[in-house]
Amino acid sequence: MASDAIISGMKTKMDKTIDLVKKDFGTIRTGRANPSLVEDIRVDYYGNQTPINQLGNISVPEPRMLVISPYDKGIMKDIEKAIQTSGLGLQPTNDGVVIRIVIPELTGERRKELAKVVKSKSEEKKVAIRNIRRDAMEDLKKHTEGMSQDEIKSVQDQIQKITDSYIDKISALTAEKEKEITTI
């Protein structure tokens, strides 16, 4: 049935949106060390912009410290420079073997700014979920041949319930991240 395919496709797209929310939130600094803070920072490696996570291992030996062990020790200066210019406010130290990054405490003002960023990213993804719902409803309208009004209404209700559940998931992730940011 066409409605099953529409709902299945919609859920797949919404799952990808939830994954993006998690990834976006992972890049927001909270005062705790997390490899996702730096793993996507791009470094010029032999003419290619390569993410740090492809250039070495990123570990968390302490709650507020990241350690990057590059596979190629010759790129350490480039990794260090990329982190410094990333806008995250991190100061890496290079001892010739590994790069250490101590995650500084967040100020109250910075926490408020980050909470706003979280809300903004959350709203963007909620809009994306609603757009996916709209597309699913339009697909349903195109495939209503042979369906009764009750069946159409039932599928529309199902689409709305699924949408609401995904919006709730984003809200829960947002609340969790805001709590993480504002907890001192």
From Swiss-Prot:
Keyword Iron-sulfur recorded: no
Annotated TM spans: none
Keyword field: Cytoplasm, Protein biosynthesis
Location(s) in or outside the cell: Cytoplasm
Coiled coil feature spans: none
GO MF entry, a single one: ribosomal large subunit binding
GO CC terms: cytoplasm
GO terms of biological process kind: translation; translational termination
PANTHER family: MITOCHONDRIAL RIBOSOME RECYCLING FACTOR PSEUDO 1 (PTHR20982:SF3), RIBOSOME RECYCLING FACTOR (PTHR20982)
Recorded family membership: Belongs to the RRF family.
Physiological role: Responsible for the release of ribosomes from messenger RNA at the termination of protein biosynthesis. May increase the efficiency of translation by recycling ribosomes from one round of translation to another.
Name this polypeptide is given: Ribosome-recycling factor
Species annotation: Leptospira interrogans serogroup Icterohaemorrhagiae serovar Lai (strain 56601)
